[in-house]
Amino acid sequence: MTLNNLQALLRRVAAREDSGHVVVYGMGNTKAFKSYSYQDLLRVAIKASVALRKTSDLHPGSVILLHFDNHWDNIVWFWAASFAGCLPAISASFSNDASQRTAHIERLSTTLMHPLCLTNERIMADFAGQDAVQPLAVETLVLNGDVSFEALPQEHPEPSLSDDALLLFTSGSSGNSKGVCLSHGQILASISGKYAVRPLPDNTSFLNWVGLDHVAAIVEIHLQAMYALKTQVHVPAADILSSPATFLQLLEKHRVSRTFAPNFFLAKLRDLLQENDSLPEPRRWDLRSLEYVASGGEANVTKTCDRLSEYLVAFGAPKDVIVPGFGMTETCAGSIFNTRCPEYDKSRSAEFASVGTCMPGISMRVTDLSNNALPSGEIGHLQLTGPVVFKRYFNNTSATQEAFTPDGWFKTGDMGCIDENGCLTLTGRAKENMIINGVNHSPHEIETALDKIPGLTPSYSCCFSFFPSGGETEEICVVYLPTYSPDDLAARAQTADAISKTVLMSTGSRPHVLPLEREALPKSSLGKLSRAKIKAAYEKGEYATYQNANNELMRRYRESTRAEPQNDLEKTLLEVFTRSLSITDDAFDVKTPIFDVGINSVELIRLKRDIEDHLGMAASAIPMIMLMTHSTVRDLATALEKLQGPREYDPVVTLQSHGHKNPLWLVHPGAGEVLVFINLAQYIVDRPVYALRARGFNDGEQPFETIEEATASYYNGIRSRQPHGPYALAGYCYGSMLAFEVAKMLESHGEEVRFLGSFNLPPHIKMRMRELDWKECLLHLAYFLDLVSQERSREMSVELAGLSHDEILDSVIQNANMERYAELSLNRPLLVRWADVAYELHRMAFDYDPAGCVAGMDVFFSIPLAIAAASKTEWRNVHLSQWEDFTRTVPKFHDVAGEHYSMIGPDHVFSFQKTLRKALDERGM
């Protein structure tokens, strides 16, 4: 079967019964996996494409930005976008630095010309703080029925070999990344060429452990495995990086013949197997299926490849199992391979392995600055050509023109030489980008972020990467001119901590930090620092005197300020930190930032897992961002106190603790819980966000009996965190009434409530409250929690009339979406307690009549419940307008999308938060 596009590839592999599966592991669980046949993949991709076609503003050729945190969703929606006639663009994970993240998203929007963006509900907050891209959660798209490919509406012609199939980006979350257009023909030529390099045995599989935004994952593994009619296995990177032994276990378990690992991970495997070799009973893995461990992205150390190869040979792999190579996004990943490593490189006494010769579909040359080919052995600029090489960057004509020579060769930006056997050895880069653990990073972006740190003189910081002697991967160094005096040790330490945190948030790597004198940082006549000269001086040891002095001053400061644990949690965490990071007690205390001890991203992941394991927490209990922003034992212990401490009632729940503006206080809806606010809070990045949760959920707690009791509790909770105004409060549905009462109490004590929001609740509610008995409260709760549909909850209201509480509860649980039930960690007693809290909240408002007034109000209104009003217009003009009787100024009304129960749900939270933020700004908040 001749393949003219990627869709034909999937149809071909799906038509064969013996073509393999897509095996997917979830985060934190390498014991269980889900397996999908290629027929399953084709089926769900077509269903998803039909759902996509119904999306407004979508037409053939549209770019669809895919932003997912798991392999399966990326795979499904890549194919769905393709079958819908669109161009999928797979997004890398965003930077943890908010300003870099926002700038990156805005650049994506501009580059891709305002694309539709698909994501998951749980990571919608990645798009907080910006308006350039409005994400759509795929959970909101309805995938109905089975649709065959033949039944798809043919709204556009089948793509040809020259048509674009995929957009990938040249770098991760930092730097001005370019969109690389990969055509159907280019990708097919690439996977054909890769598969020709070395034959693989039958009944084996491919293993991938990086995100699908990486060209090696989607082309070298996902698409090549389909071309080879083999199973492909996808595992989250964190599970592999934090446990190299897991990598070996999966190679054995799935009879993997082809995978990849950059040099830094090869070094981790070598260290693991070296330690294993010293055990009384060393562990053995059956790796007889393993033929090909592609390695690239950074230089391969020959000694590392040699030693690891010896270990792998003992488990059944061939001596040349490690295959160093060269590839870029522009060449569909690896395209030049060294299939004779390590023997070829040992025979030439090479410190770093050659990357080998070209596969079919690509040619290389090394040239001088005038693009003249150089003879073998001479170092020059690496250039490539052939069917595997891309043709253009998306929406970037100038970058495309700059990337190619007049005779059509692609300028890689790498330096190297070709030896007499036609093997390429890389010697460096013509560009300044840094490659850390195989990922490109822009030093300019990092320097811009560093300039905001008080201890640095603006424009006098320089960031570069270097390969340390005996190292396994490049490391980052930051040199800077300090603003503090040399003997101000506290400022020296604070500046080093701030630099380390900034670089780690951007790159996942802890830098070497070195303050220098002005004389050591000369500028050119144009006022610029020379990165190349500074790097060369550092590598030659010209800054050794500064380095030794700085190390001694930092040691003295840490020694004089050593802090001991103040409680059991701090003591426990300190033990976990020192053991996990293999550091001594005298080098680390509860106030030492983890970045000071040389931690890298792999060690950070392992530390996170070790803490969770030691504290008996779930694998995802501690967000990585928490560990990065609470970088000392003491700070982390404080952040974890809520999880470790006793469950005493406190109405205040912190949803977002950072920001320079006054907090926003959100009062729970009639269900009493504040889960509904979590997604909304993640978009409010410039102020703390607190929620007020009803009493009665914890063991031994009794629900509030009166509105006055609840109001006083919430008032005290607010004043304990924010003693004085101006205040910003809002309530959702029932919570609007309580927010109104709290606002009155604050004003009665002389405080200013500058913003008071009502999310879709009128002032007069007692008649509606009286309609809600325990059964109705439970059914509303079930619908509110997505356990049952709105239609089913209405049907059950009739069906369950006259039944006991136990019978009603039995029916609700039997009708519940059990996956959602489990996701919420519900059980029968908890559901009963929740229904009791909801009922008591409604009961205490049976006789509620609003009274008094407040300064003003913002009313956010959506489509009302059918029982409340016949239309949105009636709801706004007849019911909600009555707030005018209880405000000293005319209320402001904000028309928002969605229905009563969905207005701040996943479908509409993005547009809602924009309206809310604007309303806060207009009120001077």
Swiss-Prot record:
SUPFAM superfamilies, per database record: Acetyl-CoA synthetase-like, ACP-like, alpha/beta-Hydrolases
- Keyword Ribosomal protein in record: no
Q: Among its keywords, does the record have Phosphoprotein?
A: yes
Modification O-(pantetheine 4'-phosphoryl)serine, positions: 601
Q: Where does this protein act, in terms of pathway?
A: Secondary metabolite biosynthesis
The record's listing under InterPro entries reads: AB_hydrolase_fold (IPR029058), ACP-like_sf (IPR036736), AMP-bd_C_sf (IPR045851), AMP-binding_CS (IPR020845), AMP-dep_synth/lig_dom (IPR000873), ANL_N_sf (IPR042099), PP-bd_ACP (IPR009081), Thioesterase (IPR001031)
Q: Per the similarity annotation, which family is this?
A: Belongs to the NRP synthetase family.
Q: What does this protein do?
A: Nonribosomal peptide synthetase; part of the gene cluster that mediates the biosynthesis of aspulvinones. The nonribosomal peptide synthetase apvA is responsible for the production of aspulvinone E, the core structure of aspulvinones. ApvA first activates 4-hydroxyphenylpyruvate (HPPA) through its A domain to AMP-HPPA. The HPPA unit is then loaded to the T domain and eventually transferred to the TE domain. Upon loading of another HPPA unit to the T domain, the TE domain promotes the enolate formation on the unit attached.
The protein in question is named Nonribosomal peptide synthetase apvA
Give the species this sequence originates from.
Aspergillus terreus (strain NIH 2624 / FGSC A1156)
